[in-house]
A protein has these predicted regions:
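Surface-exposed, charge/polar-rich loops and edge strands
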Residues: 123, 127, 158, 168, ...
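Beta-strand elements within well-structured catalytic alpha/beta cores of enzymes
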Residues: 32-37, 70-76, 162, 183-196, ...
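Internal, conserved structured core segments that host functional sites
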Residues: 118-174, 179
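Flexible, glycine/proline-enriched loop segments at strand-loop-helix junctions
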Residues: 104-112, 163-170, 248
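Long, well-ordered alpha-helical scaffolding segments within enzyme catalytic domains
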Residues: 53-64, 171-186
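A short aromatic-anchored loop/beta-hairpin motif
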Residues: 24-124, 128-132
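Cysteine-centered motifs
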Residues: 8-9
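Basic polycationic patches enriched in arginine
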Residues: 13-20
């Protein structure tokens, strides 16, 4: 599923596009924060039928957003001991997938980086006593370039990427989100790029939509935690204790695709709005 966690400019016309969710204006913050499932490797760009609903959603979403001055992506596909930001002025492409047709390795997303903003955001993180560093060599991985190629194909917005923390401690990722709260007053789009269901053996690679009660149970739990009537303290504790959720380890044998939710929720400090709840590769996501 996809969540809008904070926004001040989305229009109600989103309903006319038949996307599920409710969008409300929030004059307090300029930042926009979204968590979404980014799909299976390069398959959305290759036109895979199992991603059709996602492709339609992702290509339509920017029309509902104010164009940001900067995009910060927390990608499930990057883990470091320290919170690490890309530091290159023009990050290269990092094709962190294998076994796909040759065209998957010709995908290009030539968006500029922003070294000055990387340094500034690293300083915000470090101020909260979280070790941080810049990586001037690493490129954009597919957690960034696949969704953004659908959303902003002109690649004309500076993009930064922030790593997860090795060890995958949920509390540490909520704290990482807390460290970014000063960004809420800026015209920045913060994206948590993961997958709310990520069991590679359970995906329907033949694009069949079969009922899966375990998948449904976890998705319903996660939607309630992120959008339901809970205090922020309760919400964060649920996310810390996510392994207690129904079918948690079935849906996430390893939690790297879930943890961008924790970062986004830590930044926003408020309930989210559900904006997509459909099937990707046969699973509710």
């Amino acid at each position: 599923y996809n969540l809008l966690i904070d926004d001040c400019c989305l229009k109600e016309r989103v309903h006319r596009k038949r996307m599920r969710g409710y969008m409300t204006e929030n004059p307090e913050n300029k930042a926009q924060i979204v968590y979404f499932s980014h799909g299976g490797g390069p398959l959305p760009i290759l036109g895979d039928p199992g991603h059709q609903k996602m492709i339609e959603f992702m290509t339509a979403l920017p029309a509902q957003l104010r164009k940001p001055d900067l995009i910060l992506v927390v990608s499930a596909h990057w883990e470091e001991k320290e919170a690490t930001l890309l530091g290159a002025e023009f990050p290269p492409m990092f094709y962190d997938y294998y076994g796909f047709p040759e065209e998957a390795y010709r995908i290009n997303y030539p968006a500029p980086g922003s070294p000055d903003n990387s340094k500034r955001i690293a300083a915000l993180i470090a101020k909260e006593h979280i070790p941080t560093k810049l990586d001037p060599k690493r490129g954009f991985d597919h957690g960034l370039f696949i969704p953004l190629k659908m959303m902003y194909p002109k690649a004309d917005i500076p993009c930064l990427q922030l790593s997860l923390l090795r060890g995958l401690d949920p509390s540490a990722h909520i704290a990482l989100g807390h460290s970014l709260r000063e960004l809420l007053q800026e015209n920045i789009l913060i994206i948590g790029s993961g997958f709310s269901f990520h069991n590679m053996q359970a995906f329907s690679w033949g694009n069949e939509n079969r009922e899966d009660p375990a998948n449904d149970a976890f998705q319903d739990w996660l939607i309630d935690v992120c959008t339901g009537n809970h205090t922020q303290q309760e919400r964060e504790q649920f996310l810390v204790d996510w392994e207690n959720a129904p079918s948690a380890r079935y849906c996430h044998p390893r939690e790297e695709h879930l943890l961008p939710v924790h970062v986004c929720q830590g930044v926003a400090n408020k309930p989210a709005k559900l904006i997509f709840n459909d099937r990707i590769l046969g699973k509710r996501s």
